[in-house]
From Swiss-Prot:
EC assignment: 2.1.1.-
One annotated Gene Ontology cellular component of this protein: cytoplasm
One protein family per Pfam: SET
Record's protein name: Histone-lysine N-methyltransferase SET5
Highest taxon, organism lineage: Eukaryota
Function: Histone methyltransferase that monomethylates 'Lys-5', 'Lys-8' and 'Lys-12' of histone H4 (H4K5me1, H4K8me1 and H4K12me1, respectively), thereby controlling gene expression and remodeling chromatin structures.
Transmembrane domains' residue ranges: none
GO biological-process terms attached to the record: methylation; negative regulation of gene expression, epigenetic; telomere maintenance
Major site of localization recorded for this protein: nucleus
Bias type Polar residues, positions: 452-462
Protein's UniProt keywords contain Transferase: yes
Positions of the UniProt region annotated as Disordered: 452-476
Length: 515
């Protein structure tokens, strides 16, 4: 028996091999804008880069792009990406309609524990909110919603659901054997659908009416639903798909129908057209409805109208509903949804960049809301609609585009004021030292803009923002991980002696091979 000789060979990883530079292209202003926003999402500290450093960063990220620093500046100015002047920003908060609180109070308070109640908000345009009726301790459970208004299967799992590889209700991947599935009655007799548990099968009340052509419900047409569902899936139209499932659920059981309709009508509403016209991103790195993966069309009307036509064909009872009402349903879903579901009680929580509540959603779509810190009696319960680790510009942009308001919470106000002070201080330093050539002071850029911030003062505003944002209330690591879809670890300000050595990976690997 021969023994193979081994030698050590160093190879380059496949994904690190240098690629040939692409053909130079001139990006559109929309592409530049959305890549700036994407950069802020990936690296929040980049929000405070001055113009030259930001330009360098953009060129490194997009080696085949040909554009000059003036183009970048024009994009930042025209899209108010660095503006902290509220008068320059469009919002649609004044167009959002809130049902009278007297019409919804009994619906909400009947479902809330005695420690929480709904009230009208004193602040203009906030509508309604949830308030503590007594002191609440940190970590205390505030309220629990066992199910959303109507459970909506995840649209991104529809292909797997149709093939029986994911649960027809919750979308979880299935690993049970066929014998186990059949033994426990978790398979469907009329199609390939399978459920992960008896609980999911019982909750999937719309399945036989939407998926089986033999349905006896005259208000639901499964064949048309199949076309509607595929249209939504192909166009990542989550809102329309969700509205369809919710409406189907309301048609199946009379008692449940009344509750679903009452809860849905109690939610704040706005036309999707108004939201679209106020947005300014195509979502390739943008922010408009990005949480549920939506793409923004240049002209969404054909997409909306086709969805509407298929919707009223699927549900004959909606024939008199009207196209504009359908758009209101879409807008209502977007401004109230949480993780692609409509939770009735949670929808009454208002936003703050320093929230005092947090939530947990398990794989069965049960929602629990806890006190993130001590809450005083009569204090409003507030959640965060956006990633709290993002910078003030990106947070306010996401809130303005998706929920229609410009946030002026204490945290935003402090960070904006800090930017203004730094901008003025550095501007004076630059002017006094006659080094204005390094600073962009074009008339379109207000001195309150971080574009005017240079690193000549020995420290970046990102350092100041990071230290000041939630200094006194900054949660620990576990808290930061809760309710955030993204998470960035900051480099420590100082390295202690006991700090363990980091493992560094490069783009080569050594391996033993046979000679």
């Amino acid at each position: 028996m021969s023994v193979s000789q081994l030698k050590i060979q160093t190879l380059t990883l496949n994904d690190s091999e240098p690629s040939l530079p692409g053909k130079p292209i001139t990006p559109s202003k929309e592409q530049i804008r959305d890549d700036v926003v994407l950069l802020w999402k990936e690296e929040p500290a980049a929000e405070d880069l001055d113009l030259p450093h930001l330009y360098d960063k953009m060129k490194i990220r997009n080696t085949d792009w040909q554009f000059d620093i003036n183009t970048l500046e024009d994009v930042l100015v025209s899209n108010n990406l660095y503006s902290v002047d509220d008068s320059q920003m469009d919002s649609y908060n004044d167009k959002i309609e809130f049902p009278d609180i007297s019409e919804v109070m009994h619906l909400v308070n009947d479902k809330l524990p005695s420690k929480v109640e709904i009230r009208e908000c004193e602040e203009l345009r906030k509508g309604r909110g949830l308030y503590a009726t007594r002191d609440i301790q940190q970590g205390e459970l505030l309220f629990h919603e066992k199910v959303p208004i109507a459970m909506v299967p995840p649209m991104d799992k529809l292909k797997l659901i149709r093939s029986g590889k994911s649960c027809s209700m919750c979308g979880v991947s299935l690993s049970n054997s066929s014998h186990f599935t059949m033994l426990h009655g978790l398979d469907c007799n009329g199609c390939n659908s399978i459920w992960c548990s008896t609980n999911c099968k019982q909750k999937d009340i719309t399945h036989p009416y939407l998926k089986h052509f033999g349905s006896k419900n005259k208000n639901i047409r499964p064949m048309d639903w199949n076309m509607f569902e595929r249209h939504c899936q192909e166009n990542i139209f989550v809102a329309a798909y969700s509205i369809g499932v919710i409406h189907a659920a309301s048609l199946i059981d009379k008692a449940q129908s009344d509750e679903i309709n009452q809860q849905f009508e109690a939610l704040a509403k706005i036309s999707q057209r108004v939201r679209y016209e106020s947005s300014d991103s195509n979502n390739i790195g943008g922010t408009f409805d990005a949480e549920i993966g939506s793409l923004k069309e240049e002209n969404p009307e054909p997409l909306w109208k086709k969805a509407f036509d298929l919707f009223i064909r699927t549900f004959p009872d909606t024939a008199e509903m009207g196209y504009e009402v359908f758009l209101e349903y879409l807008g209502r879903f977007h401004i109230n949804q949480l993780s692609g579901q409509l939770y009735f009680l949670y929808s009454f929580l208002n936003h703050n960049c320093e929230p005092n509540v947090r939530y947990d959603i398990n794989n069965k779509l049960e929602l629990k809301v806890y006190a993130r810190k001590f809450i005083k009696k009569d204090e409003e319960l507030v959640t965060t609609y956006v990633n709290p680790l993002h910078g003030v510009s990106l947070r306010r942009r996401e809130l303005r585009v998706n929920w229609g308001f410009i946030c002026n919470c204490d945290r935003c106000a402090k960070e904006i004021e800090l930017r203004k002070k730094n901008a003025v201080s550095i501007r004076e330093t630059v002017l006094n030292s006659n080094s204005s050539s390094e600073v962009s002071l074009r008339s379109g850029l207000n001195v309150t803009s971080p574009i005017a911030l240079q690193r000549s003062n020995g420290g970046s505003s990102s350092d100041l923002r990071r230290k000041s944002s939630i200094r006194n209330r900054k949660p620990d690591l576990k808290e930061m991980l809760k309710n955030s879809k993204e998470f960035e670890l900051e480099a420590p300000a100082a390295l202690g002696r006991n700090r363990s050595t980091s493992v560094r990976f490069d783009d080569i690997v050594s391996m033993a091979v046979e000679e």
